[in-house]
Amino acid sequence: MSATNTLQTNVYVDWNNDGDFDDLHDSITSDILEMSFQRGRDYASQLSGKSVAGKLTIRLENDTAKYSPDNSSSALFGSLLPGRKVQVRGVVGTYNTFPYTFPFTFNNLTETVIWTGYLDRITPMPSPHGVDTAEIVVFGVLGYLNDTYRS
């Protein structure tokens, strides 16, 4: 028996603004092509550096125009609005592997909120050659509180 540490990242958007992330399209994890974070201080110095809002940029697959605000046939039409709550969650823990198969598993995995922010903008990026994408920009709670999350 061996224990293995795991980490899987899941991203959720509360598209209908109902306070949960349980609705059909709230998980955007399967559409993510690329994701990057920026957070911390504008300078490394504690004396002159200022805290800045975290920023999450996600590039999503958008072949069906699901993330295109003008697409009236999208399941998310009317919900692709600034200010929607976004959560990044990590699935962390251990799982046990055995040299033979049981009809059940011995897992100790937990999904934990790693980061929370608010949607700033969605920019569809159609491509004449290849995959249509959309870029989502999200600012952290500090930016939301300072009202600087809006462009």
PLM features: what roles do these ranges have?
Residues M1-S151:
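Assembly/oligomerization scaffold segments
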